[in-house]
Amino acid sequence: QTETNESRFEVRNARFSVSGNVHPIVAYKAEIDLSDEGSIKMLDAYTRVFPVKNLNFTLGQMRVPFTIDAHRSPHQQYFANRSFIAKQVGNVRDVGFTGCYTQKEGFPFILEGGLFNGSGLTDQKEWHKTLNYSIKAQLLPNKNWNLTLSTQMIKPEHTRINMYDAGIYYQNRNFHVEAEYLYKMYGHE
């Protein structure tokens, strides 16, 4: 909250990304944020393999596939900030492995799932007894609609947290409406 007669300049994000293919079936991406509110962060560093049509596998540091809004980069946001759900639980990057299948014909959908360390970007040297998982399905009945269902299990410390998310959006030219619901359940092991 600002006080009267206060002001500032801020570079909120200054991202630099390099991506491409080293082979027709092998791609890479590296993305760094040179100014995430003043600090430098490595965001993505992964390799993606496309063994057959519509299927890919990704290994490295990436955004965890969860929620409808989390995969949008700052330049793709509809508002100045992320949605509350994406900001609080969906804006997670981690080191892991994902598989993704995309169906473009008939009833289009995208199904993506992965296993992750669960330690985020900062504590990658830790050893884990439990991996986190995330599964996300996007149903695309036509070009204007998107229904996204996802689930994620994380285990910080000794508490298991299961999250279930459902989101839907409709867009047509300059109109976009979106709604999302998240259910979070805590358990102990």
Q: For each predicted feature, which ranges?
A:
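Outer membrane beta-barrel
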Residues: 1-118, 129-131, 137-146
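Flexible, active-site-proximal loop/turn residues at the rims of small-molecule/cofactor binding pockets
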Residues: 22, 119, 181, 185
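Outer-membrane beta-barrel proteins
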Residues: 39-41, 66-71, 122-124, 156-160, ...
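Detector for outer-membrane/organellar transmembrane beta-barrel domains
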Residues: 128, 138-189
